Amino acid sequence: MILYRLLSWLPFPLLYAAAWLAYVLLYYVARYRRAVVQQNLRRAFPEKSEAEITSLAKSFYHRLAQVAFEIVKARRMRREQFLERVRLVNPERLREASDGLRESVIVLTIHQGNWEWMLHGASIALDIPIDPVYKPLHNRTVDRLIYDIRSQFGSRPLSMAESTRDILRRRREFRIFVMVADQSPIRRERGYWTRFMNQEAAFYQGAETIAKMTRFPVLFAQCRRLRTGYYEVEFHEVATPPYDKESHEIIDSYVRLAEQAIRSEPESWLWSNRCWKR
Protein backbone atom coordinates (compact mmCIF):
# COMPACT_ATOMS: atom_id res chain seq x y z
CA MET A 1 0.00 0.00 0.00
CA ILE A 2 2.90 2.35 0.67
CA LEU A 3 4.17 1.81 -2.89
CA TYR A 4 0.66 2.41 -4.22
CA ARG A 5 0.40 5.71 -2.37
CA LEU A 6 3.79 6.83 -3.61
CA LEU A 7 2.98 5.96 -7.23
CA SER A 8 -0.44 7.61 -7.12
CA TRP A 9 1.12 10.93 -6.11
CA LEU A 10 3.80 10.95 -8.80
CA PRO A 11 3.43 13.56 -11.57
CA PHE A 12 2.92 11.97 -14.97
CA PRO A 13 6.51 12.35 -16.26
CA LEU A 14 7.89 10.54 -13.20
CA LEU A 15 5.07 7.99 -13.34
CA TYR A 16 6.02 6.97 -16.88
CA ALA A 17 9.70 6.89 -15.99
CA ALA A 18 8.82 4.46 -13.20
CA ALA A 19 6.69 2.46 -15.65
CA TRP A 20 9.70 2.09 -17.95
CA LEU A 21 11.73 0.66 -15.08
CA ALA A 22 8.86 -1.71 -14.28
CA TYR A 23 8.81 -2.83 -17.93
CA VAL A 24 12.53 -3.67 -17.76
CA LEU A 25 11.98 -5.69 -14.60
CA LEU A 26 8.92 -7.49 -15.99
CA TYR A 27 10.44 -8.41 -19.33
CA TYR A 28 14.15 -8.90 -18.67
CA VAL A 29 14.39 -9.83 -14.98
CA ALA A 30 11.16 -11.44 -13.78
CA ARG A 31 10.30 -12.65 -17.31
CA TYR A 32 6.65 -12.43 -16.27
CA ARG A 33 4.67 -14.92 -18.40
CA ARG A 34 7.04 -14.38 -21.32
CA ALA A 35 6.52 -17.90 -22.64
CA VAL A 36 2.73 -17.46 -22.55
CA VAL A 37 2.87 -14.06 -24.24
CA GLN A 38 5.20 -15.20 -27.02
CA GLN A 39 3.20 -18.37 -27.64
CA ASN A 40 -0.04 -16.38 -27.86
CA LEU A 41 1.55 -13.91 -30.28
CA ARG A 42 2.97 -16.65 -32.50
CA ARG A 43 -0.39 -18.38 -32.75
CA ALA A 44 -2.29 -15.16 -33.37
CA PHE A 45 0.18 -13.88 -35.98
CA PRO A 46 1.74 -16.89 -37.73
CA GLU A 47 2.77 -14.63 -40.60
CA LYS A 48 5.13 -12.59 -38.39
CA SER A 49 8.84 -13.34 -38.08
CA GLU A 50 10.45 -14.19 -34.75
CA ALA A 51 12.02 -10.72 -34.67
CA GLU A 52 8.60 -9.12 -35.15
CA ILE A 53 7.12 -11.29 -32.39
CA THR A 54 9.89 -10.26 -30.00
CA SER A 55 9.42 -6.58 -30.84
CA LEU A 56 5.66 -6.88 -30.34
CA ALA A 57 6.17 -8.65 -27.00
CA LYS A 58 8.45 -5.87 -25.75
CA SER A 59 5.93 -3.23 -26.79
CA PHE A 60 3.22 -5.16 -24.96
CA TYR A 61 5.19 -5.30 -21.70
CA HIS A 62 5.94 -1.59 -21.88
CA ARG A 63 2.26 -0.78 -22.43
CA LEU A 64 1.28 -3.19 -19.64
CA ALA A 65 3.52 -1.38 -17.16
CA GLN A 66 2.19 2.01 -18.25
CA VAL A 67 -1.44 0.93 -17.93
CA ALA A 68 -0.84 -0.63 -14.51
CA PHE A 69 0.68 2.60 -13.22
CA GLU A 70 -2.06 4.69 -14.87
CA ILE A 71 -4.69 2.64 -13.04
CA VAL A 72 -2.96 3.36 -9.74
CA LYS A 73 -2.73 7.05 -10.68
CA ALA A 74 -6.49 7.13 -11.38
CA ARG A 75 -7.28 7.35 -7.66
CA ARG A 76 -5.66 10.81 -7.52
CA MET A 77 -6.89 12.17 -10.84
CA ARG A 78 -9.47 14.92 -11.18
CA ARG A 79 -12.48 14.89 -13.47
CA GLU A 80 -10.85 17.50 -15.69
CA GLN A 81 -7.83 15.25 -16.22
CA PHE A 82 -9.99 12.37 -17.42
CA LEU A 83 -11.88 14.66 -19.78
CA GLU A 84 -8.56 15.84 -21.20
CA ARG A 85 -7.01 12.38 -21.52
CA VAL A 86 -9.99 10.23 -22.62
CA ARG A 87 -11.96 11.41 -25.67
CA LEU A 88 -15.26 9.89 -26.81
CA VAL A 89 -15.29 9.68 -30.60
CA ASN A 90 -19.01 9.05 -31.07
CA PRO A 91 -21.04 9.48 -27.86
CA GLU A 92 -24.12 9.89 -30.02
CA ARG A 93 -23.99 6.14 -30.75
CA LEU A 94 -24.50 5.43 -27.05
CA ARG A 95 -27.25 8.04 -26.78
CA GLU A 96 -29.08 6.53 -29.75
CA ALA A 97 -28.80 2.99 -28.39
CA SER A 98 -30.11 4.11 -24.99
CA ASP A 99 -32.97 6.19 -26.44
CA GLY A 100 -31.47 9.43 -25.26
CA LEU A 101 -29.90 7.97 -22.10
CA ARG A 102 -33.25 6.64 -20.91
CA GLU A 103 -33.00 2.90 -21.62
CA SER A 104 -30.27 0.64 -20.23
CA VAL A 105 -27.47 -0.59 -22.48
CA ILE A 106 -24.86 -3.32 -22.16
CA VAL A 107 -21.40 -2.24 -23.31
CA LEU A 108 -18.86 -4.98 -24.01
CA THR A 109 -15.17 -4.27 -24.28
CA ILE A 110 -11.75 -5.93 -24.09
CA HIS A 111 -8.51 -5.51 -22.15
CA GLN A 112 -7.08 -2.97 -24.57
CA GLY A 113 -5.90 0.62 -24.22
CA ASN A 114 -6.75 1.57 -20.66
CA TRP A 115 -10.08 -0.06 -19.83
CA GLU A 116 -10.20 1.55 -16.37
CA TRP A 117 -9.63 5.10 -17.62
CA MET A 118 -12.21 4.43 -20.33
CA LEU A 119 -14.82 3.77 -17.63
CA HIS A 120 -14.09 7.07 -15.87
CA GLY A 121 -13.73 9.10 -19.05
CA ALA A 122 -17.08 7.96 -20.44
CA SER A 123 -18.89 8.32 -17.12
CA ILE A 124 -17.63 11.88 -16.61
CA ALA A 125 -18.15 12.99 -20.23
CA LEU A 126 -21.71 11.63 -20.34
CA ASP A 127 -22.45 12.63 -16.73
CA ILE A 128 -23.96 9.24 -15.93
CA PRO A 129 -22.94 6.38 -13.63
CA ILE A 130 -21.53 3.37 -15.44
CA ASP A 131 -21.63 0.04 -13.62
CA PRO A 132 -18.76 -2.33 -14.49
CA VAL A 133 -19.18 -6.07 -14.02
CA TYR A 134 -15.96 -7.54 -12.65
CA LYS A 135 -14.35 -10.75 -11.51
CA PRO A 136 -13.10 -10.34 -7.91
CA LEU A 137 -9.34 -10.75 -7.45
CA HIS A 138 -7.89 -13.34 -5.10
CA ASN A 139 -5.87 -10.72 -3.23
CA ARG A 140 -8.46 -8.92 -1.09
CA THR A 141 -6.32 -5.82 -0.57
CA VAL A 142 -5.77 -5.32 -4.30
CA ASP A 143 -9.40 -6.20 -5.02
CA ARG A 144 -10.59 -3.51 -2.61
CA LEU A 145 -8.18 -1.00 -4.15
CA ILE A 146 -9.50 -1.67 -7.66
CA TYR A 147 -13.08 -1.51 -6.39
CA ASP A 148 -12.44 1.91 -4.85
CA ILE A 149 -10.84 3.17 -8.07
CA ARG A 150 -13.79 1.99 -10.17
CA SER A 151 -16.43 3.47 -7.87
CA GLN A 152 -14.86 6.88 -7.24
CA PHE A 153 -17.13 8.79 -9.66
CA GLY A 154 -20.44 7.19 -8.71
CA SER A 155 -20.16 3.89 -10.56
CA ARG A 156 -21.35 0.77 -8.78
CA PRO A 157 -19.13 -2.22 -9.61
CA LEU A 158 -20.97 -5.56 -9.71
CA SER A 159 -19.25 -8.87 -9.12
CA MET A 160 -19.95 -11.53 -11.75
CA ALA A 161 -21.72 -13.64 -9.13
CA GLU A 162 -24.28 -10.94 -8.34
CA SER A 163 -24.50 -9.21 -11.72
CA THR A 164 -27.37 -11.15 -13.31
CA ARG A 165 -29.61 -10.86 -10.26
CA ASP A 166 -28.83 -7.17 -9.78
CA ILE A 167 -29.33 -6.24 -13.44
CA LEU A 168 -32.65 -8.08 -13.61
CA ARG A 169 -33.82 -6.46 -10.37
CA ARG A 170 -32.99 -2.99 -11.71
CA ARG A 171 -33.90 -3.60 -15.33
CA ARG A 172 -36.38 -0.71 -15.37
CA GLU A 173 -33.76 1.76 -14.15
CA PHE A 174 -31.46 3.49 -16.61
CA ARG A 175 -27.93 2.12 -16.28
CA ILE A 176 -24.94 1.49 -18.50
CA PHE A 177 -23.48 -1.92 -17.71
CA VAL A 178 -19.89 -2.50 -18.86
CA MET A 179 -18.42 -5.99 -19.21
CA VAL A 180 -14.84 -6.80 -20.18
CA ALA A 181 -15.71 -10.07 -21.89
CA ASP A 182 -12.45 -11.34 -23.39
CA GLN A 183 -11.49 -13.65 -20.52
CA SER A 184 -12.09 -17.39 -20.79
CA PRO A 185 -14.43 -19.01 -18.25
CA ILE A 186 -12.79 -21.19 -15.61
CA ARG A 187 -15.06 -24.07 -16.60
CA ARG A 188 -14.47 -23.90 -20.32
CA GLU A 189 -17.01 -26.62 -21.05
CA ARG A 190 -19.66 -24.04 -20.09
CA GLY A 191 -18.29 -21.43 -22.45
CA TYR A 192 -19.17 -20.74 -26.05
CA TRP A 193 -16.37 -21.87 -28.34
CA THR A 194 -15.58 -19.98 -31.51
CA ARG A 195 -12.65 -18.98 -33.70
CA PHE A 196 -10.69 -16.05 -32.26
CA MET A 197 -7.29 -14.82 -33.46
CA ASN A 198 -6.62 -18.00 -35.48
CA GLN A 199 -7.53 -20.33 -32.60
CA GLU A 200 -10.55 -21.85 -30.90
CA ALA A 201 -11.40 -19.91 -27.73
CA ALA A 202 -14.09 -20.11 -25.06
CA PHE A 203 -16.15 -17.07 -24.07
CA TYR A 204 -18.48 -16.39 -21.18
CA GLN A 205 -22.14 -16.55 -22.21
CA GLY A 206 -23.38 -14.36 -19.36
CA ALA A 207 -23.53 -11.06 -21.26
CA GLU A 208 -25.47 -12.64 -24.11
CA THR A 209 -27.85 -14.36 -21.69
CA ILE A 210 -28.53 -11.11 -19.82
CA ALA A 211 -29.08 -9.18 -23.06
CA LYS A 212 -31.64 -11.74 -24.24
CA MET A 213 -33.43 -11.76 -20.88
CA THR A 214 -33.62 -7.96 -20.64
CA ARG A 215 -33.77 -7.11 -24.35
CA PHE A 216 -31.08 -4.48 -23.79
CA PRO A 217 -29.12 -3.33 -26.86
CA VAL A 218 -25.43 -4.24 -26.87
CA LEU A 219 -22.51 -2.03 -27.92
CA PHE A 220 -18.77 -2.60 -28.19
CA ALA A 221 -16.37 0.02 -26.80
CA GLN A 222 -12.96 0.18 -28.46
CA CYS A 223 -10.27 2.04 -26.50
CA ARG A 224 -7.36 3.25 -28.64
CA ARG A 225 -4.11 4.71 -27.39
CA LEU A 226 -3.36 8.01 -29.11
CA ARG A 227 -0.06 8.63 -27.35
CA THR A 228 1.33 8.04 -23.88
CA GLY A 229 -1.41 8.85 -21.38
CA TYR A 230 -4.09 9.77 -23.93
CA TYR A 231 -6.89 7.58 -25.31
CA GLU A 232 -10.01 7.70 -27.42
CA VAL A 233 -13.12 5.53 -27.15
CA GLU A 234 -15.32 4.56 -30.07
CA PHE A 235 -18.65 2.72 -29.79
CA HIS A 236 -19.76 0.07 -32.28
CA GLU A 237 -23.08 -1.73 -32.52
CA VAL A 238 -22.94 -5.39 -31.50
CA ALA A 239 -26.62 -6.32 -31.64
CA THR A 240 -30.09 -4.91 -31.05
CA PRO A 241 -33.30 -6.67 -29.96
CA PRO A 242 -35.28 -8.69 -30.78
CA TYR A 243 -32.75 -11.49 -30.37
CA ASP A 244 -32.84 -15.03 -31.69
CA LYS A 245 -32.85 -17.21 -28.58
CA GLU A 246 -31.18 -20.10 -30.40
CA SER A 247 -28.28 -18.21 -31.98
CA HIS A 248 -25.10 -16.68 -30.58
CA GLU A 249 -25.28 -13.52 -32.67
CA ILE A 250 -24.18 -11.32 -29.76
CA ILE A 251 -21.01 -13.27 -28.93
CA ASP A 252 -20.16 -13.78 -32.61
CA SER A 253 -20.46 -10.06 -33.34
CA TYR A 254 -18.48 -9.18 -30.20
CA VAL A 255 -15.67 -11.57 -31.13
CA ARG A 256 -15.48 -10.12 -34.65
CA LEU A 257 -15.22 -6.56 -33.32
CA ALA A 258 -12.73 -7.59 -30.62
CA GLU A 259 -10.46 -9.23 -33.19
CA GLN A 260 -10.59 -6.17 -35.44
CA ALA A 261 -9.63 -3.95 -32.50
CA ILE A 262 -6.74 -6.21 -31.49
CA ARG A 263 -5.34 -6.44 -35.02
CA SER A 264 -5.44 -2.66 -35.36
CA GLU A 265 -3.36 -2.17 -32.19
CA PRO A 266 -1.96 -5.55 -31.09
CA GLU A 267 0.63 -4.26 -28.62
CA SER A 268 -2.06 -2.81 -26.34
CA TRP A 269 -4.08 -6.01 -25.74
CA LEU A 270 -3.54 -8.22 -22.68
CA TRP A 271 -1.51 -11.05 -24.22
CA SER A 272 -0.57 -12.49 -20.82
CA ASN A 273 -4.04 -14.03 -20.51
CA ARG A 274 -4.34 -17.77 -21.16
CA CYS A 275 -7.29 -17.28 -23.49
CA TRP A 276 -6.86 -20.37 -25.60
CA LYS A 277 -6.00 -22.99 -22.99
CA ARG A 278 -8.43 -25.92 -23.00
Language-model features and meaning:
Residues 2-6, 59-60, 83-84, 110-112, ...:
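Short acidic/polar alpha-helix capping motifs at helix-coil junctions
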Residues 1-109, 143-144, 148, 154:
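Membrane-anchoring hydrophobic helices of lipid-metabolizing enzymes
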Residues 84-91, 112, 139, 157-160, ...:
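A conditional alpha-helix N-cap/helix-loop micro-motif detector
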